[in-house]
């Protein structure tokens, strides 16, 4: 591998709560959710090509090259901007697929921001976020890089600043299909809307949790194990579960006990994504 011109992180996110308010006529769901980033994620490398080709140099098992959101993001930006340059892209994958922590969406957002920089397009955040929304509902929050209360299908973002604890995230070895969860007839779809401020705490939950637990015993097991030490929550539509701790030492202590049988990691919550902190010093 040649040395990339630019290396950037693609951070994970957590849904600290996820309420489903109803189903729209177009089949999508109205929801309210609270996004916060983690100082942990994938890493991407980028080098400009002169021939206009987009090449992801890293194979992702189970995902064809042209179906990868990284490639889709690069080609969408290339097409919309009219840029004739190309890009070689490398991926160091740490975030699980179907984990509910934003792996694919975060990779796509990092790609948009990196290519905007390297191709010197000068697109602003609003324009990049609008393009990101065509790739996935979670892409805009990663483009903007600030913890947010999201409404609509997840695209209406209000910046917020919740507490930034340490988290233990457990990763059950299953990939959860978002479409499968949202189409489940037993999914709660009538939660009353809540206000953005104060930042939701006690009255918050994940409306997908009961459906995911019923369909995936591995997730139920992880929630039960973590729940012995702290409040255990599901992020997104799963499969990852998480719990908050006041400091790294306590999170590490529980991690040492649980990761003998489960995969997991400890990371700091952050209201400004590590991607944006890196971009600010370029």
From Swiss-Prot:
InterPro entries: GHMP_kinase_C_dom, GHMP_kinase_C_sf, GHMP_kinase_N_dom, IspE, Ribosomal_Su5_D2-typ_SF, Ribsml_uS5_D2-typ_fold_subgr. Gene3D superfamilies: 3.30.230.10, GHMP kinase, C-terminal domain. It is an enzyme of class 2 (transferase). Keywords: ATP-binding, Isoprene biosynthesis, Kinase, Nucleotide-binding, Transferase. It catalyses: 4-CDP-2-C-methyl-D-erythritol + ATP = 4-CDP-2-C-methyl-D-erythritol 2-phosphate + ADP + H(+). The keyword rRNA-binding does not apply. It comes from the Bacteria. ATP binds at residues 96-106. Pathway: Isoprenoid biosynthesis; isopentenyl diphosphate biosynthesis via DXP pathway; isopentenyl diphosphate from 1-deoxy-D-xylulose 5-phosphate: step 3/6. Disulfide bonds: none annotated. GO terms for biological process: isopentenyl diphosphate biosynthetic process, methylerythritol 4-phosphate pathway; terpenoid biosynthetic process. GO terms for molecular function: 4-(cytidine 5'-diphospho)-2-C-methyl-D-erythritol kinase activity; ATP binding. SUPFAM superfamilies: GHMP Kinase, C-terminal domain (SSF55060), Ribosomal protein S5 domain 2-like (SSF54211). The active site is at 13, 138. Its EC number is 2.7.1.148. Pfam families: GHMP_kinases_C, GHMP_kinases_N. Belongs to the GHMP kinase family. IspE subfamily. Catalyzes the phosphorylation of the position 2 hydroxy group of 4-diphosphocytidyl-2C-methyl-D-erythritol. HAMAP family: IspE. This is 4-diphosphocytidyl-2-C-methyl-D-erythritol kinase. The gene is ispE.
């Amino acid at each position: 591998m040649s040395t990339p011109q630019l290396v950037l992180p693609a951070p994970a996110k957590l849904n600290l709560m996820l309420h489903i308010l109803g189903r729209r006529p177009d089949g999508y769901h109205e929801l309210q959710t609270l996004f916060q980033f983690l100082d942990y994620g994938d890493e991407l490398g980028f080098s400009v090509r002169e021939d206009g080709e987009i090449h992801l140099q890293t194979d992702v098992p189970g995902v064809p090259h042209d179906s990868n959101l990284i490639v889709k993001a690069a080609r969408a930006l290339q097409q919309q901007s009219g840029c004739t340059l190309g890009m070689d892209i490398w991926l160091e994958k740490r975030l699980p697929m179907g984990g509910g922590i934003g792996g694919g969406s975060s990779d796509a957002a990092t790609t948009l921001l990196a290519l905007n920089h390297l191709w010197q397009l000068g697109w602003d955040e609003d324009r990049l976020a609008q393009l990101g929304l065509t790739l996935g509902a979670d892409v805009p929050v990663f483009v903007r890089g600030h913890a947010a209360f999201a409404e609509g299908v997840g695209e209406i973002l209000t910046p917020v600043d919740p507490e930034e604890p340490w988290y233990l995230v457990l990763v059950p070895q299953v990939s959860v299909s978002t479409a499968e969860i949202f189409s489940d007839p037993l999914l709660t779809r009538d939660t009353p809307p809540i206000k953005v401020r104060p930042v939701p705490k006690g009255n918050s939950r994940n409306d997908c949790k009961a459906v995911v637990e019923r369909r995936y015993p591995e997730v139920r097991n992880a929630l039960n194990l973590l729940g012995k030490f702290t409040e255990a929550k599901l992020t997104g539509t799963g499969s990852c579960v998480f719990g908050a701790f006041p400091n790294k030492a306590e999170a590490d202590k529980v991690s040492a006990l649980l990761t003998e049988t489960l995969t997991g990691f400890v990371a700091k919550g952050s209201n400004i994504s590590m991607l944006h902190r890196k971009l600010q010093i370029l």
